[in-house]
Amino acid sequence: MVQDTEVVEAGTSKETETTVDVEKEIQECMGAGKKDLLCNDYSEAVNCFQEACTLLSGKHGQMAEECCEAYYYYGVSLLELARLENGVLGNALKGVPEEDADGDSDQEQEQFEKPDLPETEREKLREEVEAAMATEDEDTQEERGCPRRVEKKKEDDKPKESEKSAEKSDEKEKEEKQAKVESSTVKDVKDEKSSDKPVESSNTEEPGTSGTSASSSKENESEEDPDDISNMQLAWEMLELAKVLYKKHDKSKTNKQMVAQCHLKLGELGLEVENHPQAIGDFLECLVIQKDLLPETDRKLAETYYNLGLAYSFEKRYDNALEHYQSALDVLEARVDMLNELIESNEGNKEKEKEIISECKEVGELKELIPDINSKIEDVILAKKQMQKLDGSPFRQASEGESSSGLGASTSDDKPCSTIPIRKVAPTSVPVAKDSPSDITHLVRRKRPSPDEDNQPAESKENESKKAKQEETEEATNGHSAVKKDTDVTDKNGTNGHSKTPKKDAAKRR
C-alpha cells in the first residue's frame, strides 16, 4: 500500500509540473506576442499567438473562456500581417536596390562580350571557334551516315609527316605548324565534347519521365491545398470566434469591451476587403456598446466615429460621413479641453509629474489628429458639392423617377431627351413639293376620234375660223360705233348752244 501511495504521489507531482510548465509557456508566448505586436513585428507575433492558441486549446478545450484573449490577439496580428502584405508588398522592397536590372544586363554583356581582349587572344579564339565549327560539321555528317575515318587518319598522320620533312623549306614548315595547331585544337575540342556528351545524354535521357515530372509539378502548383487559407480569412475566423466566446461567457464589463473591440477589428477587416456594408454594421454595433460603457471623452469613441465616417464616404453617403467625422472631432476637442483642465489643476504637484507629462504628450498627439479630421471633412464637402453638380447637369443620364432636364419628377408620358425627336411633321400639313406627283397626263388614255370626225373636210374647219374672226371684228366695230354716238350727242349739244345750265340761270333771274 505504501508503494502504491508513493506511485500516485509521483504521478500527481509530474502532472502538476507539466501543467505549471504549460502555463509558463503560455504566459511567455502571450507576452512575447504582445511585445512583437507593439513593435510591429507581425510575423513573429503571429507565431507566438499561434503557439499560445494551440497550448490553450489543448489544455482547456477549443471553446473555453481562457482561449478568448489568445484568439483575439491572434486575429489582430493576422489582420495586421495581411495589411502589410496587401499594402503594395508592404515594406518588403525597402532594401532592394533599384538598379538590379542594369546589373543583370551588365553581367550578361560580360559573359558574351569581352571588349578589352588583345588581338592575339582574339585570333586564338577565332581559330578555336573555326575548329569547333569544323568538328561540328563532321559530327553532323557522321550522324547522317557519312563516315570520315579516312580523313581522321590523314589528320592524325600529318604530325608524323611533318617530323620526317624537317629539311623542307620554311614555307612548308609554316604550313605544317599550322596543321599541328589545328589538329591539337581539334583534339582538345573533341575531348571536351566527349566529356560533355554523357552529361547531355543524362540530361536528355528519359524525356517522358521529365515531361511527366514537369507536368506533375505544374499540376501541384495549380492545385491549391484546402488547408492553405489566406491571412485575411484566418483573421476573420479568429475574430469571429473570439467575439462569440466573449458573448457566450461571463457578461462582465471587460468582456463587453472586448466584444466591442472584436466588432471594431471586424469592421477594419471589412474596409480592407472593401465590404463596406458589413464594415458599417460592425462599427455601429461597436459604437452602441462603447456608448454604454465609455465616457464621452474617450478616444476609442473618436476612433469608431472616424472609421464610420470613412466607411460612409466609401459608400458615397456623404451626409452620414459628415455627421460621424464631426462627432469624432467633437470628442477629440472635448478630450483636449479635459486634459488641459487636468494639467492646470495638477500644476505644481510633484507627486503627479508623470501624469502631467503623459497628459501633455496626449494633448500634442490629439492636436496633430484634429487637422487630419478637418481635412477629411473638407474632402467630403467637396465630394458632396461635385455630386450635386452632377445631379443638376443636363449631361447626366436621367435616372428612374427623374425628368431629363433635372427639374423634378417626370410623368409617365414624358420621355427622356435622348428619345424626343427634334421635329415632327404633322399629318395634316401640306406635302412637300419633292413628294408631290408629277404630270401623269401622258399616262391617261385619250378618246379615239370617231370616223365621222376624221372624214370632215378641211373647209368646215376653215369656216369655223372665219366665223370666229367675223365675231371679233363685229365686237370691235360695235364698240367703235358706240363711242361715235356718244361723241355725236355731245357735239350736237355744243353746236346748238342749248344746254341745261343756261335755262336754269334764266329761271333764277325771273
Swiss-Prot record:
A motif (Nuclear localization signal) lies at residues 444-451, 465-471. Residues 95-227, 391-510 are annotated as: Disordered. May function as a nucleosome assembly factor during rapid embryonic cell divisions. Residues 204-217, 398-411 have a biased composition (Low complexity). Pfam families: TPR_12 (PF13424). Residues 98-110 have a biased composition (Acidic residues). It is found in: Nucleus. GO terms for molecular function: histone binding. Embryo and larvae. This is Protein HGV2. The keyword Repeat applies. Residues 111-129, 142-199, 459-471 have a biased composition (Basic and acidic residues). TPR repeats lie at residues 260-293, 302-335. The gene is HGV2. Belongs to the NASP family. GO terms for biological process: CENP-A containing chromatin assembly; DNA replication-dependent chromatin assembly.
